[in-house]
C-alpha cells in the first residue's frame, strides 16, 4: 500500500501480511474513509498498476491540507483511464484530495 501525505512528494510504502482492518485504515487516513472515484491506476517505479485509492470522508468543518501529489496522480489516472482530468490548462482544479491518501494495487 502506498500512503501519500500532504506536503510530501514520495509515498510511504506499507506492507501488510493480510488486508488491513477498517480500524487500521481509519487510523492511517484520519477517520472514516471513501473510495476516490476514477482513481483506477497509478504509476509507481515506472510501472502502471491497476489500483483502488481511499481518502478520508472529510465530514468535519476542518478540511485537511491539500495533498498535491495525490491530486496530480488522480488527475493522471483520470486522463489515462477515462480521457478527462481534474486540472485545466489554466491550472484550475475541478476537485482535489486533502489529507492522507492510501493506494492499494489491484491483483
Language-model segments: residues:
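Detector for the mature cores of small, proteolytically processed
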Residues: 1-107
Amino acid at each position: 500500500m502506498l500512503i501519500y501525505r500532504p506536503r510530501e512528494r514520495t509515498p510511504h510504502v506499507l506492507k501488510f501480511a493480510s488486508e488491513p482492518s477498517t480500524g487500521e485504515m481509519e487510523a492511517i487516513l484520519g477517520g472514516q474513509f471513501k473510495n476516490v472515484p476514477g482513481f483506477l491506476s497509478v504509476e509507481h517505479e515506472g510501472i502502471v498498476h491497476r489500483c483502488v485509492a481511499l481518502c478520508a470522508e472529510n465530514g468535519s468543518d476542518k478540511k485537511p491540507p491539500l495533498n498535491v501529489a495525490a491530486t496530480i496522480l488522480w488527475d493522471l489516472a483520470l486522463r489515462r483511464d477515462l480521457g478527462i482530468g481534474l486540472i485545466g490548462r489554466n491550472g484550475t482544479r475541478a476537485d482535489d484530495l486533502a489529507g492522507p491518501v492510501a493506494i492499494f494495487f489491484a491483483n
